[in-house]
Amino acid sequence: VFSGETPGNADVSPRAVPTGVAYHGRSTHNASASIHMSRLNPELGLWQGIALLSTSLLGTGIFVVPALAATVAGPASLWAWLILIVLVLPVAFTFAQLGRRFPHAGGAPHLIGRAFGPRLERLSALLFLAVLPVGLPAALNIATGFWQVLFDLDRGATLVIQLLTLAAFLALGQRPAKASGWVQGLIALAIVGSVATLWAFGDLPRADMPLLPPLEGDGPKLAAALGVMFWCFVGLEAFTHLGEEFKRPQRDFPLALLLGVLLAGLVYWACSVAVLSFGTYGDPARDAGALPLLFDQVLGGHAR
């Protein structure tokens, strides 16, 4: 049985404690359980953590999911975003507390290992790795789509752009978490600034598009929209590995996780208001290019 908190630079492995032995209280260097020093440098502050989390949740979803949700549920999708935020916050709070108590680079698999043993820890780690061959090509394809808006690209040029994007991912991944925090902080500002620009120059909200429209028998549509929107918050549990990289994980990690979820959810909701107001949804082509179409309508053809 494990209770209490471990310090940010210590890892108490369940395999190090003999079977049947109860281990209570805070871990110290004199404890009989084996303790390993942190393998990561604690460099992240609160704002960098918020930037890392919010931009990761926004990701490529900010460009397509609001339009997909609008196609499924229409104006009722605005309610669905708020419902989803309320549902996700307890999950975020749970992982925030786990990351605060047991900060470790292993993240969710490490927590599973503490609770259920090394076999399930390895299995869950493999499941996380299995996402890469599926998710990364999709992200690269979406990134290439933005270049195709600007240039007429053939298959060779598209492949070169995807390889360069992948190389940029790998290069940034070799840098400390602080560097990623700064880069993603700039991305977060760009995303929030883009949505704010749409609101400012698009005169949002409009009188004909209420921020919370009345619900009239939209229950099935809400459920379908929530299924689409949940994609935006899948992977929230993966952020538990960042707990070890915070300078003050006890204080900053839970705040960063909760505030990052709130910020991402509100940006999604604000983008959905813009999509619904300008009608950039309704079919696969418009859903995929919703954001460029929005800028085209609000600021003119060069803005896209």
Please name every model-derived segment.
Residues H110-G117, V149, L258-R304:
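TM-loop-TM module centered on a large, flexible mid-protein loop between adjacent transmembrane helices
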Residues L44, G49-F63, L68, F201, ...:
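Hydrophobic, membrane-embedded alpha-helices of multi-pass small-molecule transporters
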Residues P66-V72, I142-D152, L204-E216, Y281-G289:
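Membrane-interface helix termini and inter-helical loops of multi-pass transporters
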Residues Y23, H29-A67, V72-A76, L89, ...:
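Membrane-interface "cap" regions at the ends of multi-pass membrane proteins
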Residues T144, G156-P205, E216-G219, L257-V261:
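Membrane-interface loop-to-helix entry segments
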Residues I50-A51, S77-I83, R122, L159-L164, ...:
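Hydrophobic alpha-helical transmembrane segments
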Residues L68-V72, A80, L89-L166, A171-Q174, ...:
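Hydrophobic transmembrane alpha-helices that form the core helical bundles
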Residues S3-D11:
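Intrinsic, low-complexity polybasic segments
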